[in-house]
């Protein structure tokens, strides 16, 4: 008997259920970092300053259901917006699926573990600064959120050896 392919391999973003759409978010928090755009050149610059609602440890929104009331410029991603905007990180699952690619090994839908996005060094955990603690955004410009990361695989012990024996 053939196993059914996962939804992200068989459906377009516009065909996803609400649950499928929400599960595509890997919880990296990169989209919740402030971005700057040069008014003359339109060049985009990423910062490591996070929205005040982002829990920089879990990399999840602390007020997801009410975020638009608390942060009026928070964006509600839609399939149309994913296709239009240029500031989603290249590692964003919405972008990856839109481009017909498979999700990476560290994505929780592939790994079965929401911690792999952090273990692989994809998330903003340990790298983001809360906007309430930051100074001028121009002082926090970084390039890493705009690059596809080279994820590090979690260390695995050799077969037959336990972590205690290492």
Swiss-Prot record:
Residues 154-166 have a biased composition (Basic and acidic residues). Pfam families: CxxCxxCC. InterPro entries: Puta_zinc/iron-chelating_dom, UCP006173. Residues 147-166 are annotated as: Disordered. Belongs to the UPF0260 family. NCBIfam families: PRK05170.1-5, PRK05170.2-5. This is UPF0260 protein GbCGDNIH1_2046.
């Amino acid at each position: 008997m053939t196993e059914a392919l996962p939804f992200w391999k068989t459906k377009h973003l516009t065909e996803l259920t609400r649950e499928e759409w929400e599960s595509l978010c890997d919880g990296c928090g990169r989209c919740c970092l402030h971005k700057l755009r040069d008014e003359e050149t339109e060049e985009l610059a990423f910062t490591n300053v996070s929205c005040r609602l982002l829990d920089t440890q879990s990399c999840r929104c602390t007020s997801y259901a009410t975020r638009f009331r608390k942060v009026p410029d928070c964006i509600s991603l839609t399939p149309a917006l994913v296709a239009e905007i240029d500031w989603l990180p290249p590692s964003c699952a919405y972008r990856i699926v839109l481009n017909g690619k498979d999700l990476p090994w560290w994505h929780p839908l592939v790994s079965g573990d929401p911690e792999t996005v952090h273990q692989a060094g994809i998330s903003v955990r340990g790298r983001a600064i809360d906007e309430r603690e930051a100074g001028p955004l121009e002082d926090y410009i970084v390039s890493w959120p705009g690059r596809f990361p080279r994820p590090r695989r979690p260390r695995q012990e050799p077969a037959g050896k336990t972590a205690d024996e290492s």
